[in-house]
Amino acid sequence: MKNVLLPNNQERKRSLSNSEIFTFDDKRLLIGQINSLFGVQGWVKIFSHTHPRENILFYQPWHINVDANWQTLEIIQGCVQAKTIVAQIKDVFDKEQARAYIGIDLYIKKSQLPQLKSGEYYWDDLIGLEVINKAKIILGKVSNLVDTGSNNVLVINGEREHWVPYISPFLIKVDIDNQIILVDWDENF
């Protein structure tokens, strides 16, 4: 347990007894963070990394890491409230109990994601893949992807940073088994 200093300077143990401790056999993915309180009945506001942001509510259960212990966090209900996501955590009934969760990152197991069709990939599958152009020059490794609104862009770090649109004709092939992405991209761009 971790001591949490509350606004009135009283210490209280952060107790997440409603959670089940477990060990991850599966890769975990960061999907959001509890960032503030909502109301007085123990609801919390969630900053979601999912797109669209309300999709975070469909990935249940959430997993949290408290003092190096992975735990399952049960959500009783959640919804979109104006421009934010709010949720009620099981066995949390007031704002003082909810305060202990502020700042905690929310994860899911990768196995919780829906199966994709052949040729479709989650961004997480592409991070770390080596990117090679048609001239067989290694541009670097995918460090991130950016959604520009019209298409996604691979951010590649190598001798220099490259931003390659993740669309045809620039994207030629993704080979997950060999950890390679083949692109039609000049090394000087």
From Swiss-Prot:
Disulfide bonds: none
Keywords, sorted A to Z: Chaperone, Cytoplasm, Ribosome biogenesis, rRNA processing
Cited InterPro entries: PRC_barrel-like_sf, PRC_RimM, RimM, RimM_N, RimM_N_sf, Transl_B-barrel_sf
One GO-annotated biological process of the protein: rRNA processing
Record has Heme as a keyword: no
Limits of the PRC barrel domain: 118-189
GO cellular component assignments: cytoplasm; ribosome
GO terms for MF: ribosome binding
Pfam family, one: RimM
Localization, UniProt: Cytoplasm
Function (record text): An accessory protein needed during the final step in the assembly of 30S ribosomal subunit, possibly for assembly of the head region. Essential for efficient processing of 16S rRNA. May be needed both before and after RbfA during the maturation of 16S rRNA. It has affinity for free ribosomal 30S subunits but not for 70S ribosomes.
Subunit structure: Binds ribosomal protein uS19.
HAMAP family named in the record: Ribosome_mat_RimM
Domain-related comment: The PRC barrel domain binds ribosomal protein uS19.
Family: Belongs to the RimM family.
Name of the protein in question: Ribosome maturation factor RimM
Organism: Ruthia magnifica subsp. Calyptogena magnifica
Gene: rimM
